[in-house]
Amino acid sequence: MSSDWQKLRDEDGLWRLCPAQPELAFEGEALPMIRRYCGDMRGKRACVIGSGDNYAAFALAGMEAHVTSIDISARQLEIARVRADELRLQISFVQSDADSLHLVEDNSIDLVCSTNGFFVWIAEPGAVFKQVYRVLKPGGFYIFYDVHPFQRPWKDQAAPLEMAKPYSETGPFEQVEAGQVSFEFNWRLSDLLNPLLDSGLVIRRLAETQAKARFWQDFSYEPSGDERLLDWHNNPRSGLPAWLTVAAQKPE
């Protein structure tokens, strides 16, 4: 997690509200898809991979699911553990790569989910999808939302619309922050959906939706923002979908 992102998460304090207001934890059509395909989450087993700020984990725990939160970052998990204790949420925190899920049993999970910012850190999406397929119960769902791949090629500015790179250029891209080097990926739709299908999962629903105005300003989940940025005449990128949401099922 970048220092800017961490600062915003600390300032907005929305993690305290997620258990009672799960809509704060999900963008795109993720929460409606969870409700449509998974129904009442009480007593069901949910696994959040690449859990990051753990908003989704807190929300699912508030929905009375038995939640396992998995992330590669020990620091992220420790922050989330302290917050979960404060909120009196029962969540299992596991440090693991998303492409191994080594402590999660086969055929044991009703819902796997991942949220915004997950796939930029994933070098082999197909390896992740195979693990998701393995841990899901037959009939279980993997539901994810992330920034739509169509947003990745552009420079981070409202106007003029300028490309920063070709859509086909997926990385790895080197990032350096506070002396730490990391690598990110900008996967295309085909890079995500083809290996998802190859894993054996079946896509039941796909949504490509717009974002709130705040999306075009900063990383905050807070409401409000400059509504003019939702007009593609002022901000051409807003004419493209901002979020990709997918619901995929492991066959019965």
Regions found by a protein language model. Name each.
Residues 45-100:
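Class I SAM-dependent methyltransferase SAM/SAH-binding core
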Residues 99, 103-111:
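A short acidic, Gly/Pro-enriched loop at the edge of an enzyme's catalytic core
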